Amino acid sequence: MKLGMVGLPNVGKSTLFNAITKAGAESANYPFCTIEPNVGVVSVPDKRLDVLEKMYNTKKKVYTAIEFYDIAGLVKGASKGEGLGNKFLSHIREVEAIVHVVRCFDDGNVVHVEGSVDPIRDIETINLELIFSDLEVLERRMEKSVKLARSGDKTAKYEYEIMGRIKEQLEAGKPVRTLEVTEEENVFIKSLFLITSKQVLYSCNISAFSSSSSPDNSSSILALTTITSEFSSAA
């Protein structure tokens, strides 16, 4: 499985990536320290596999592996190319799921691209850029399909209708993953490689000098819980 770490610059993506993978990727206090994705592979221990190894006395044991991709920070306007946005967005399309890292700590020594720490604003910024990018991709696909759909091709018509529903969802500011679809429709949606159709895990980066229950951290986490529920899967 491939997981991509996304977020604004300087939110702690590379730090989290290094903590998980022990890869030693560069982490610095300035935007766009990362340009090309850093890649790390982590094995997932499974006690069931250990039992089977003993039962059958196998010579080789291979755990499931997860590939983590530390993707460069996105900024407002990324869908229009700001901050090398188009290049970074293409990297996100290649992963299977997303880890969205959100900065919830206030530290004047760590630069914030927006000049202040506001987790909810930052989440909305990233989500909107991903939605705008998906809209652009979807509209190009619809332009190619419309003639075939109007000619009476049943498959093209079926797919065009699904894309129409997806477009309405995106134009309403909602990610594709929150759209209720059938299993058959989901197979087609996956073929579109839309970023907002991927499942997301939100990672809250709190201050290293206080606990998650401190007033500042707990209020940020509560606010994040509320807004991220709006962007969760329809299921």
Name each model feature, range by range:
Residues 1-82, 86-107:
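Conserved G1/Walker A P-loop phosphate-binding module
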Residues 31, 35, 48, 61-67, ...:
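Helical mechanochemical/support elements of P-loop NTPase systems and associated helical scaffolds
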Residues 40-43, 72-79, 93-132, 136, ...:
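Conserved Switch II/interswitch segment of TRAFAC-class P-loop GTPases
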Residues 213, 218, 222, 226-229:
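Alpha-helix boundary/capping motif
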Residues 60, 195, 211, 215-218:
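Residue-level detector of transmembrane insertion/anchoring sites
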Residues 25, 77, 129, 141, ...:
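Active-site-proximal flexible loops/turns
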